């Protein structure tokens, strides 16, 4: 460890910034946010200084540095391109035993400024020790996505209840209690702006702990998106990493499953065509049972839980049994897969509406409003349609679409194994068989498919995909 991380209390302290550049303005802003009074020595100030908060605590005291400016100062920051000039300031500060930071010159620093994640009063600092500030900023950006902005409010809530917890809970149990609180629905309530509910839940947890009553569980119904872990929402990822149990379907990709809490129990419930590992009714009651055992239960579904995901049925059961739950939307396959295939679902010149339908066969037939679906100015997105693809295409032609209507089928959309086959309603069933496509797939029908050749941007297997893809005009032997 090259540096010892230390947080300085600069409130009402006096600091000097040498330099008037945009970077100097950013350094001055940090000092002002920490409550310091800031003096600036520079021949001119960047416009960024005009935008700083609490400017009444900032004063330009000189055009150039002189040692006398260090009188009464508690810290010095130097932003100076001229190495010799920076050396003079650093030496003068060190001679007075003042902490000094020189931007981009670690050798002249007695302290360094980390990248900061501010969730006051919670503060997180990330530093590369001056070796790679850009890398530290990138790491900070990643952490920003994982730490909700409401953490400050959560900390304030805990502070208000600290005395109550001290009175109600034995010293040896307090640490475990607060860990349970911060990993419970109390935190999620604060993050979603339900502060009064969070206080009520915290009150209940204090009473339960004092009386040694069992913990109260909750169900997180989370959409995992179309498969690519980069498409998870921040909220989904946060809940995935705090759940005690993960109940997941076949359509949840392994990379996404790997992002769940490592020590969480995992329960696979299948949900594959004609092979439901666990019947839906049993899944519903499993969620109730797990929550009533006090477990934070993650119900992880591919896509969005409310679009052909049977999420509504599951939370109906939870409501009937008085189980707390929350729903996190996911990017549905239609939106995610179409985007990665380079096919816009709507377009001013081609489609003014879009229909999501399920291609699931029931007794070898479809139960669809074909007249409402088979419209030339509409894009049709068909989930779970691979098995019935020939019948789907035939029915769409029968109900008004032409045989040469553009159509595409996408396998493993958004993943590195994505494959896209394009053709027409007349040719797509044969092309899908020749390509050997396997579920999961998504079918897109409509004139917007014409845009794929121009707009395709995601090519994880460019050479293989080019060989598999077929132009809209089918070869003679397939026409």
From Swiss-Prot:
A molecular function annotated in GO for this UniProt entry is: sirohydrochlorin ferrochelatase activity
State the UniProt keywords alphabetically.
Cobalamin biosynthesis, Lyase, Methyltransferase, Multifunctional enzyme, NAD, Oxidoreductase, Phosphoprotein, Porphyrin biosynthesis, S-adenosyl-L-methionine, Transferase
Which InterPro entries does this chain map to?
4pyrrol_Mease, 4pyrrol_Methylase_sf, 4pyrrole_Mease_sub1, 4pyrrole_Mease_sub2, CobA/CysG_C, NAD(P)-bd_dom_sf, Siro_Cobalamin_biosynth, Sirohaem_synt_dimer_dom_sf
Pathway it works in: Cofactor biosynthesis; adenosylcobalamin biosynthesis; precorrin-2 from uroporphyrinogen III: step 1/1; Cofactor biosynthesis; adenosylcobalamin biosynthesis; sirohydrochlorin from precorrin-2: step 1/1; Porphyrin-containing compound metabolism; siroheme biosynthesis; precorrin-2 from uroporphyrinogen III: step 1/1; Porphyrin-containing compound metabolism; siroheme biosynthesis; siroheme from sirohydrochlorin: step 1/1
Question: What EC number(s) does this enzyme carry?
Answer: 2.1.1.107, 1.3.1.76, 4.99.1.4
Q: What is annotated as the active site? A: 249, 271
User: Per the UniProt entry, what are the Gene Ontology biological process annotations, in alphabetical order?
Assistant: cobalamin biosynthetic process; methylation; siroheme biosynthetic process
Q: Which residues bind NAD(+)?
A: 22-23, 43-44
According to the record, the residues making up region (Uroporphyrinogen-III C-methyltransferase) are 217-479
Q: Does the keyword Coiled coil apply?
A: no
| Stretches for region Precorrin-2 dehydrogenase /sirohydrochlorin ferrochelatase | 1-202
Described function: Then it catalyzes the NAD-dependent ring dehydrogenation of precorrin-2 to yield sirohydrochlorin. Finally, it catalyzes the ferrochelation of sirohydrochlorin to yield siroheme.
Q: What family does the entry list?
A: In the N-terminal section; belongs to the precorrin-2 dehydrogenase / sirohydrochlorin ferrochelatase family. In the C-terminal section; belongs to the precorrin methyltransferase family.
Question: What name does this protein carry?
Answer: Siroheme synthase
């Amino acid at each position: 460890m090259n540096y010892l991380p230390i947080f300085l209390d600069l409130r009402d302290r006096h600091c000097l910034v040498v330099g008037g550049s945009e970077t100097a303005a950013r350094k001055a802003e940090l000092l002002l946010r920490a409550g310091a009074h800031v003096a600036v020595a520079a021949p001119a100030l960047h416009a960024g200084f005009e935008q700083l908060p609490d400017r009444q605590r900032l004063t330009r005291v000189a055009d150039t540095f002189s040692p006398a400016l260090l009188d009464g100062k508690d810290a010095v920051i130097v932003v100076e391109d001229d190495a010799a000039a920076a050396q003079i300031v650093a030496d003068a500060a060190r001679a007075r035993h003042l902490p000094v930071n020189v931007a981009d010159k670690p050798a002249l620093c007695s302290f360094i400024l980390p990248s900061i994640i501010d969730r006051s009063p919670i503060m997180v600092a990330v530093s590369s020790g001056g070796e790679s500030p850009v890398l530290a900023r990138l790491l900070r950006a990643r952490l920003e996505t994982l730490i909700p902005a409401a953490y400050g409010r959560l900390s304030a809530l805990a502070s208000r209840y600290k005395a109550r917890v001290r009175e109600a809970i034995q010293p040896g149990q307090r640490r475990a209690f607060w860990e349970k609180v911060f990993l419970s629905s109390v935190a999620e309530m604060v993050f979603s702006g339900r502060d009064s509910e969070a206080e009520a839940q915290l009150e209940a947890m204090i009473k339960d702990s004092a009386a040694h009553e069992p913990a109260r569980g909750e169900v997180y119904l989370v959409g995992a998106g179309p498969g690519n872990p980069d498409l998870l929402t921040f909220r989904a990822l946060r809940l995935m990493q705090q759940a005690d149990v993960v109940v997941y379907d076949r359509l949840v990709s392994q990379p996404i499953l790997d992002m769940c809490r490592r020590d969480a129990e995992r329960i696979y419930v299948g949900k594959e065509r004609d092979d439901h590992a666990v019947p839906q009714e049993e899944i519903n009651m499993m969620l109730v049972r797990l929550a009533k055992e006090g477990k934070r239960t993650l119900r992880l579904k591919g896509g969005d839980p409310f679009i052909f995901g049977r999420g509504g049925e599951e939370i109906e059961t939870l409501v009937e049994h008085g189980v707390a739950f929350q729903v996190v939307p996911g990017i549905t396959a239609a939106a995610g897969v179409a985007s990665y295939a380079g096919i816009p679902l709507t377009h001013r010149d081609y489609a003014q509406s879009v229909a999501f339908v399920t291609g699931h066969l029931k007794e070898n037939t479809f139960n669809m409003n074909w007249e409402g679906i088979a419209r030339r100015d509409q894009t049709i997105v068909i989930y779970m349609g691979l098995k019935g693809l020939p019948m789907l295409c035939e029915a769409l032609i029968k109900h008004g679409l032409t045989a040469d209507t553009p159509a595409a089928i996408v396998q493993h959309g958004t993943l590195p194994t994505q494959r896209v086959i394009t053709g027409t309603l007349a040719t797509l069933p044969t092309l899908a068989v020749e390509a050997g496509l396997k579920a999961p797939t998504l079918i897109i029908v409509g004139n917007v498919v014409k845009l794929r050749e121009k707009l395709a941007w995601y090519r994880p297997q460019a050479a293989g995909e080019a060989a598999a893809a077929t132009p809209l005009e089918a070869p003679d032997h397939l026409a």
